[in-house]
Amino acid sequence: MPDGEVNKLRDVIDKKILDARRVFFSEPVTDKSAADAIKKLWYLELSHPGQPIVFVINSPGGSVDAGFAVWDQIKMMTSPVTTVVTGLAASMGSVLSLCAAPGRRFATPHSRIMIHQPSIGGPITGQATDLDIHAREILKTKKRIVDVYLEATGQPREVIEKAIDRDMWMTADEAKDFGLLDGILFSFDDL
């Protein structure tokens, strides 16, 4: 299929998905992917305020700041958002899966969820004072993430802090039992 036809088909598919009031987030959480998701979410919000939106997540995680940008925008909308994990919601992807109101957080049966504490990638260099600033900032970020998991699950702080000490992988059923999900979704008709 020539490139022009592929792009045209992609546009038709994207329009059909948006017409169904669904936003797919199937990539790492970056500034660009977050901006794209926010634009689609607000397009749906402004087109038909208050109408339900389904936010489908399959993400290995990524930028905490970009993820919280999506989180904050969803919380500001009047449209009720339902999150559906399909495949993987790891790291910041798992946090995004919790931006829906209680009762609106689902996963498909074979999905996996991974929670952990935030990390800094790459070599860190700089003056001791700068390193201290970075250390304090990542601890603030860890607290924000712990608070999200606390609010979503109702688990005690000690349980959450222990759970995220290392990568904690869960099946959809395990994530539901832990309080990260409200249910397992077998069909979009069940929403």
UniProtKB/Swiss-Prot annotation:
Its annotated compartments are: Cytoplasm
Its EC number is 3.4.21.92
What reactions does this protein catalyze? Hydrolysis of proteins to small peptides in the presence of ATP and magnesium. alpha-casein is the usual test substrate. In the absence of ATP, only oligopeptides shorter than five residues are hydrolyzed (such as succinyl-Leu-Tyr-|-NHMec, and Leu-Tyr-Leu-|-Tyr-Trp, in which cleavage of the -Tyr-|-Leu- and -Tyr-|-Trp bonds also occurs)
Q: Which residues cross the membrane?
A: none
The protein's matches in InterPro entries, at most eight in alphabetical order, are given as: ClpP (IPR001907), ClpP/crotonase-like_dom_sf (IPR029045), ClpP/TepA (IPR023562), ClpP_His_AS (IPR033135)
Asked if the record carries the keyword Cytoplasm, the reply is yes
Q: Which GO terms describe its molecular function?
A: ATP-dependent peptidase activity; ATPase binding; serine-type endopeptidase activity
Q: What is its main location?
A: cytoplasm
**Origin: domain of life:** Bacteria
Q: Which UniProt keywords apply?
A: Cytoplasm, Hydrolase, Protease, Serine protease
Q: Its GO CC terms?
A: cytoplasm; endopeptidase Clp complex
Is Chloroplast found in the keyword set?
no
Q: Which residues form the active site?
A: 91, 116
* Positions in coiled-coil regions: none
GO terms classed as biological process: protein quality control for misfolded or incompletely synthesized proteins
Q: Which PANTHER family match?
A: ATP-DEPENDENT CLP PROTEASE PROTEOLYTIC SUBUNIT, ATP-DEPENDENT CLP PROTEASE PROTEOLYTIC SUBUNIT, MITOCHONDRIAL
Which HAMAP family is this protein grouped with?
Answer: ClpP
Q: Which family does it belong to?
A: Belongs to the peptidase S14 family.
Subunit structure of this chain's protein = Fourteen ClpP subunits assemble into 2 heptameric rings which stack back to back to give a disk-like structure with a central cavity, resembling the structure of eukaryotic proteasomes.
Q: What is this protein called?
A: ATP-dependent Clp protease proteolytic subunit 1
Source organism per entry reads Chlamydia caviae (strain ATCC VR-813 / DSM 19441 / 03DC25 / GPIC)
The organism's taxonomy opens as:
Bacteria, Pseudomonadati, Chlamydiota, Chlamydiia, Chlamydiales
Gene encoding the protein: clpP1
